[in-house]
Regions:
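Phosphate-group recognition and catalysis centered on beta-loop-alpha active-site segments
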Residues: 1-319
Length: 319
C-alpha cells in the first residue's frame, strides 16, 4: 500500500473494478467480482480499485451501479424482463432498497451481458476473509460515495485485518464528503483515505483549502485535471510541488457504443462532454500520453492496467 500512497519515480496503476473482461484476457470475467480481484493478484497488478454500495440492510457489497439490472440476474427475482440499458426498460431495482438476502442470490453477468457467470455479488467482509485465507498481496482501494459505507467497510477491514488494515485497504472518497483528513479519520480510522477532486466540486468547496486540510500525511490525492492548463491544474501542481503523489482516473468508455459510458443507474449512456463543468472544454484523460507525458500523474486508475503498465515501462516509469 505504501507504494500507492507515497510519491516515487515510478507511476503506480490501479486495476479499475479489478482485472476483468477483455482487459484480463478472460472475456467472461465480470467486473467487481472475487475473480477480478484474484486475477489482478495473479497477474501482479499494483493494486485494484473496487466499487462498494450498501444493501438496504447495511451490508457492503461490490457493485459499481446504484441499480442491479446491468450487471446481475436480478430480473429472475422479479416479475418482468431482463434490463436493457439502451432502452432503460426492464427490471432494475436500486441496491439501496434491496436486502442482502436477495442480493446474495444474484449472479453476475459477463461484461457483454449475454451470459450468466458463476460469480455472486461479493460481500466486502467475505472478500476480506477470502483475501486473507488465500494470502493475496494486491492492495485494495475502494471507491466509496457516502459516510455510512466508509464506516461499514472500515469496520469489516478492522475485523479481518485488525491493526494491519491500512496495509491492505484504502478508500477513495470525494473531497466534498470529507473536507479534511481528520474528518475522514473519524469514520475511516483503520484504512487510509485518498481524497478525490473533480471540476464540478469547484462550486461546492474551497478546493485549495481542502487540499491543505488533507496534506499533513503526504499521502496520495486524486485530482482530475481534464486538460492542460484547465481547471484544477494549479491545484495539482500545488500538490506535486510538495512531493505528494497525484492520481487521475483514465476515462475509458465502458458503454456498448463508441465514446459512451454507462450511467450510475446502469442506463446507457453519457459522454465525457456531458460532464463538462464551468470552463471545461475538453477531457483528455483517456489518453495515456496526456496522463503521463503531459501531466505526469503518478497514480493511474484504469480499466486497462496492462496497457498502461506496458506504456509506462517503455518510458522507464514502471518497474
Amino acid at each position: 500500500m505504501r507504494r500507492i500512497l507515497f510519491n516515487s519515480s515510478n507511476t503506480v496503476v490501479l486495476a479499475h473494478r479489478g482485472l476483468w473482461g477483455k482487459y484480463a484476457g478472460i472475456p467472461d470475467m465480470p467486473e467487481n467480482s472475487r475473480g477480478s480481484l484474484q486475477i489482478a493478484n495473479d497477474q501482479c497488478m499494483d493494486g485494484v480499485e473496487l466499487d462498494v454500495k450498501l444493501t438496504s440492510d447495511g451490508v457492503p457489497v461490490l457493485l459499481h451501479d446504484y441499480n442491479l439490472g446491468r450487471t446481475t440476474t436480478v430480473w429472475q427475482q422479479h416479475p418482468g424482463v431482463k434490463y436493457d440499458p439502451l432502452t432503460n426498460q426492464g427490471v432494475n431495482p436500486s441496491i439501496l432498497v434491496t436486502p442482502w438476502s436477495q442480493v446474495s442470490q444474484l449472479f453476475l453477468l459477463t461484461p457483454d451481458r449475454r451470459t450468466t457467470t458463476g460469480y455472486h455479488v461479493p460481500r466486502v467482509d467475505e472478500l476480506f476473509t477470502y483475501y486473507k485465507q488465500r494470502q493475496l498481496r494486491t492492495p485494495m482501494v475502494f471507491d466509496i460515495k457516502d459516510a455510512k459505507t466508509v464506516r461499514a467497510v472500515n469496520s469489516a477491514a478492522n475485523k479481518v485485518f485488525g491493526a494491519a488494515s491500512a496495509s491492505y485497504v484504502a478508500a477513495k472518497v470525494n473531497a466534498t464528503l470529507y473536507t479534511s483528513r481528520s474528518a475522514y479519520q473519524a469514520d475511516g480510522d483503520g484504512m487510509v483515505g485518498i481524497p478525490v477532486f473533480t471540476t464540478n466540486m469547484l462550486g461546492k468547496i474551497n478546493v485549495r483549502q481542502t487540499i491543505g486540510a488533507w496534506l499533513s500525511t503526504g499521502e496520495a490525492m486524486e485530482i482530475n485535471v481534464k486538460q492542460l492548463g484547465g481547471q484544477l491544474q494549479s491545484d495539482a501542481d500545488f500538490v506535486r510541488e510538495r512531493d505528494v503523489r497525484v492520481g487521475v482516473f483514465q476515462a475509458i468508455p465502458d458503454g456498448p457504443r463508441a465514446s459512451e459510458f454507462y450511467k450510475n443507474n446502469g442506463e446507457c449512456c453519457y459522454k465525457l462532454s456531458d460532464l463538462f463543468y464551468g470552463k471545461d472544454t475538453a477531457d483528455n484523460r483517456g489518453s495515456l500520453d496526456y496522463i503521463e507525458r503531459v501531466e505526469a500523474f503518478g497514480l493511474i486508475t484504469t480499466d486497462d492496467p496492462k496497457t498502461a503498465i506496458a506504456y509506462l515501462r517503455a518510458r522507464g516509469k514502471h518497474d
